[in-house]
Each structure stands twice: as structure tokens, then as C-alpha cells.
Amino acid sequence: MLKTNSTYCTLRWGYPIVDFGRGSIRTCCRTFEERVEPEEFEEKGSDIFLNSDYQIKNRLAHLKGYKNKLNSCTTCWRLEDGKIESPRLPEWLPYPYSFKDSDKNMVKEFTDKELTEVTIVNYVTNEELKLKDITLESDILRSQNPFMLEILLSTHCDLKCSYCSPQFSTKWAEEALKFGDVDKGYMDWSKPHIDSEEFEDSFWLWFDDIAIHSLDRIGMVGGEPMIQPNLFSFLDRMMESYNRLDTKKKPILWFVTNLNASEKIIDRFYEYLPKLCEVFQVEVHASIESFGKKAEYIRFGLNWDRFVRNANKLCSYEDKKNFHFGFQIANNSMSITGLLDFIKVAKDLQDTYKRGITLKHNIVTIPEFHSPMILTKDFAKYLDEVVDYLEKLPVNRMLPVPDPLGTWESFLEWITNIRDSIKNQEGEKIDWVSGDVNNIRASFYEWFKKYDERREVNFLEVFPEYKEFYNSCKELCEVKNGII
């Protein structure tokens, strides 16, 4: 179901992401990070993790429909403009609030005048509140009930994925520094502005007092979580909290990993799983969206054979009740033609180990030239093949997975949505930040030309089926730069 034209999203209230490496916090993976400054940290203490001044102001903008003040949310609206399902969650308010039943349709298809008349109900106290009367001091703008938390211990990473950046990968940062894309000032800027030990102490205070009681999901992301030196000590501390506080909950703990780690590291994680599975429902989501040499090009530094070996190792884990394995699929402008072969790998893992394999779907929107929405309609045929393969399985007879958004049925619906949008050239109608779609395509050529030169690879050798598109982008780039 495509989203409505409201600006509301409950993720702003319930989905904090804490970056210990930079001392920053944000809500939702698609928003900008907010560096914690000493003055506000001293004032708010552990309340900084969900109720900073920045977050309070953004929540007010979400409720009031101030789209022009929500710059970090534009990727979702652009997806929706392109007829693609976005991650935005406009359907419900944070506990204990709800839109009044008689106003719910108005919220979905509002006009500015109507929006001010919407009534919100506190269903614990039955107190009613007009949306127009909400101010920065209103309780509804505060959050004490996060439902999902992501942790970045650091951006330490062993890959330079094409659509990543120096912000999330130390390998990327090293390359950017080498070629002058960033300077030493950027590297200094990326360091925490507050004492790291105080930040971590404050986090655990917030986690034990607030977050642990409402969290349903906790994600370890990166960087690359498997190679963080303090991964296991952090997990030990988290398990200690759950055991000590006896919350009676068994939340999901998931890891988003490139699965490129050494056999020694994967073996250690494998041996640690029984301990984790006593406290959590554990999920490992391997980040991948293509196959073989294409996957190695997109995720520069990846060893495909090692990736497959590690996937088989984890799938062999016998506890199918408390441990689940799957893939985090970031559909992008290069993944389309290798997707079918990758899906067949996932199917083989299910058949070999008789366990459900999760297919979590996502889409790259930044940088814009990595979005599949810039592709010409002839690329839809590759997704026709994926859709045909999935429909013939059929997907509703695949082994079950714990996440409704990770089922093969959900993935089929998602990839059909992308296929149709490419086929209908919805990308040409999107209000791109960098200009019209041809400007983005020109940047595609410019960027991958530089990518090939720096990393000593060859785009067209790996993706010969892109030749016509690539040359078209080259011509657009030359026109843009006044060469022709």
C-alpha cells in the first residue's frame, strides 16, 4: 500500500540509532545524524537519546505537516512520488496516543485547513487534544517508548561498497582521504564532540531505565559489526541488563553484516550463538543483492566464495526456533541484472538446510545515481524474470520466516513494485535533488568512470548488459560538461 500525503511518521518517536564511534544519534536510518554537543548533553543527560531539542522540533513538524522543515525525510517522499513503497510509518501515533476514529481518513488525505482540526486522543487518560494546539512543550512530542534500536559501535569496515560513503566505512574514508575527497578536517569533525566513556555510561542508564522495557528489536549495524573489537563485550553487557532486570521479553537481536569476515571470526560468532539465543531471538541479515563478480564489484573488497561459505556455516546452526538467517537486499542501479541468480542462492540455502530464509528489502536513494529509478525501461525485463521465478515457486509455499516484511511474498510484492516503476519510467517524474533524471544519469557515468580508475576495475566487463545505458549516460555527461 502506497503512503498517503500526510507528513507523519512514527519512526521519529520510536526508532533511535546510536553511533558510539561519532557520539551521534538519529531517528530512522534515512535521516541525518545529530551530533551530541557537550552543552545539551550536560543539560539532558540520558534523555538526549530520544528527546533532544532537534527531535522535538522535527516531531512537531511531522504532526503539523511542515514538509519544508523535514529535509532529512525527503528520500521517503521521493520514493512515494516514484510510486515506490517507502519505509515511512504514518498509520499510528506513539503510545498512548491515537488519532480520533472520526478523523483518521482526514489524516490520510488532508488539506492544510483540515489538518488543523484533527483530534488526538490519549487512550489512557481519554484526554483529547487538537492538533492545532500542540506546541513544543506538549507531552506528545516526547518519547519514552522506543520499539526499535540500532547500534553502531564504530564505522570500522573491511569493504568499500559502491553506494556507501566515508561516513559509514573506514575503508571508504581512507580512500576519500587519499584522493582528496575529504581532508583531515573532515576526519577530525567525525570524532565525538563529547567524552566517549560518559556517552556510553549515559546510554546504559537510558537503556536500563527506559528502552529495555519497550524495545521489540535491537540491531547491530555498522560499519561491519562482526569485526568490531568490542562486539562481544557490548553484547555481554546487554545480556546482563536483560537477565538482571528480568523484563519477561525476548526481543529480536539482528545483525546486518557483509558476511566477509574470516573463518575464525565467523566460528567465534557461531560458538557464541547459544548464549545469545537464551536471551534473544537472533537474526543475521547478510547484506547482498547480486551474485558473483557483480556482487564483488558493487561491494568492493567482498570475496564471493567466502561469503557463500559463511552463509552456509550460519545456516547450518541447528536452533531454528531462536536463530534465523536471511538477506538485507539493497536494490540499486547495478543490482537489477544479478538479482535472479542471487535469489536462486537463497532458495538453495532454504532447500539445503530446511530453514526459512528472510528476504528483507530496501532501496538505495542516496547517492541518487545509485537508485534503480534512474534506469531506462528496458531494464524492467530483468525484474520480469525475477517476478516470474518467484511466482512459479510459489512464494506462499516457502518456509516461514519471523518477520512479515521479510517473507518471500513481501519481497515479490516489493520487487514487482520496482519493476512496474522502472517500466513506467516513474523516475523521470521524480523531483530529484540534483536536477532531472538525465542529470542524474550523467552523474552515473562520471562517478563510475572515477570508480573504475581508482579501484582498477571495469564496469562494462562486469556489466556488459549495461553498455547501451552506460554509453547513453556518457553522452549526457559530455553534453553536461560542454564536451559535445
Label the predicted regions:
Residues M1-K44, I48-L50, Y54-Q55, N68, ...:
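Radical SAM enzyme [4Fe-4S]-AdoMet core and its adjacent flexible, acidic
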Residues M1-Y15, E43-E150, F168-K171, E175-G185, ...:
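N-terminal [4Fe-4S]-dependent radical SAM core
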Residues N5, S24-I25, K69-S72, L153, ...:
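Secretory pathway export signals and precursors
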Residues C9, C28-C29, C73-C76, C157, ...:
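Short cysteine clusters
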Residues P146-H156, Q167-F199, H213-P229, S241-D267, ...:
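Core AdoMet radical
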Residues L149, F203-W206, F234, F307-N310, ...:
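Alpha-helical packing segments of well-folded alpha/beta enzyme cores
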Residues F203-I210, E271:
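Short amphipathic alpha-helix with an adjacent loop that forms part of the alpha/beta core around
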Residues F232-D236, K264-P274, G338-L340:
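Distinct, well-ordered alpha-helical segments
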